[in-house]
Amino acid sequence: MTNIRKSHPLIKIINHSFIDLPAPSNISAWWNFGSLLGVCLILQILTGLFLAMHYTSDTMTAFSSVTHICRDVNYGWIIRYLHANGASMFFICLYMHVGRGMYYGSYTFSETWNIGIVLLFTVMATAFMGYVLPWGQMSFWGATVITNLLSAIPYIGTDLVEWIWGGFSVDKATLTRFFAFHFTLPFIVSALAAVHLLFLHETGSNNPSGMVSDSDKIPFHPYYTIKDILGLLVLVLTLMLLVLFSPDLLGDPDNYIPANPLNTPPHIKPEWYFLFAYAILRSIPNKLGGVLALVLSILILAIIPALHTSKQRGMMFRPLSQCLFWLLVADLLTLTWIGGQPVEHPFIAIGQLASILYFFILLVLMPISGIIENRLLKW
């Protein structure tokens, strides 16, 4: 068996990636999220495939086809809710994975980090298009509002929006193409994830200390396979609690009303995992400025390696940066809360303050704290 594992052209690749892979001996549970994201992606592709067998991407029948899946298809309700809540688990793992990368300085692996940012954008696009497919009120108006943001692009904006819509409003053409993209993009995400892993295995994993661990490596299997299975059990337990006890907890009740272009919901908002970016978008009164802030709130991750001023890689031994990091986490949670609130006082002011603080921490305070900590090392 060992000979096949090490000599067969295909099994050899799997062996070098998941079995005999040299891994640092001190990586913590924060390194579990990569494998959990892989599991989430497989779950989403499988449940999505079964949903696509019964779903119809037509404005007249989309809503009733989702109802049909839940009522008439064998275990259709559990497949639908696994898919919907699986997306929430996917984003929880994604944000924790990115947060770990920021905390422990994993962004110094620039190729892996940049592919990760492309992956994040692709997954966000996939999730947005998936939210449109049930063709409820929030699906329709969310699609209308978010795609309409592109009209802020000077000169070509309006033409671009109508090109994406396939007409003069969100209609059948929009729904059909969104379904086509939503079906295709997860496979592109899988390919990008393979490239992400390829770049990671070129350098080897980072570790909590941030130091080079070449002199102290252990095989991935059995040590980290067992550790990853523990994380997987926690993920599955959380997901099943959501699906079986409160499947609509993270959804919007408005999406149980069929899409009606003549009736606007009182408060249009995206899924909870986009609320922080939506709050940043809304905090700027100018449309183009809001769109730029929305894109930059994610794209800012690309310049984090350039803003690294500390002599140490991670934040494990940097108390000032640790305080700023957790302040950033609290700020993102505040933005998520604000994104779900109506546009009125005091939520507008809180959203604007939280948005300014978000960019100020990342662009100004973090680099300054790195310089101060370098000075403290000399004492």
UniProtKB/Swiss-Prot annotation:
Binding site for heme b b562: H83, H182
CDD domains given in the database record: cytochrome_b_C, Cytochrome_b_N
Membrane topology listed for this record: Multi-pass membrane protein
GO terms of molecular function: metal ion binding; ubiquinol-cytochrome-c reductase activity
Pfam entry (one): Cytochrome_B
Segments passing through the bilayer: 33-53, 77-98, 113-133, 178-198, 226-246, 288-308, 320-340, 347-367
GO terms of biological process kind: mitochondrial electron transport, ubiquinol to cytochrome c
SUPFAM superfamilies xref list: a domain/subunit of cytochrome bc1 complex (Ubiquinol-cytochrome c reductase), Transmembrane di-heme cytochromes
GO CC terms, sorted: mitochondrial inner membrane; respiratory chain complex III
PROSITE patterns named among the record's database cross-references: CYTB_CTER, CYTB_NTER
Cofactor note as given: Binds 2 heme b groups non-covalently.
Cofactor(s) the protein requires to work: heme b
Binding site for a ubiquinone: H201
Keyword entries, A-Z: Electron transport, Heme, Iron, Membrane, Metal-binding, Mitochondrion, Mitochondrion inner membrane, Respiratory chain, Transmembrane, Transmembrane helix, Transport, Ubiquinone
Residues that hold heme b b566 according to the record: H97, H196
Gene3D superfamilies: Cytochrome Bc1 Complex, Chain C
Compartments where located: Mitochondrion inner membrane
Role this protein plays: Component of the ubiquinol-cytochrome c reductase complex (complex III or cytochrome b-c1 complex) that is part of the mitochondrial respiratory chain. The b-c1 complex mediates electron transfer from ubiquinol to cytochrome c. Contributes to the generation of a proton gradient across the mitochondrial membrane that is then used for ATP synthesis.
Misc remark: Heme 1 (or BL or b562) is low-potential and absorbs at about 562 nm, and heme 2 (or BH or b566) is high-potential and absorbs at about 566 nm.
Record text on subunit structure and interactions: The cytochrome bc1 complex contains 11 subunits: 3 respiratory subunits (MT-CYB, CYC1 and UQCRFS1), 2 core proteins (UQCRC1 and UQCRC2) and 6 low-molecular weight proteins (UQCRH/QCR6, UQCRB/QCR7, UQCRQ/QCR8, UQCR10/QCR9, UQCR11/QCR10 and a cleavage product of UQCRFS1). This cytochrome bc1 complex then forms a dimer.
Family: Belongs to the cytochrome b family.
Protein name: Cytochrome b
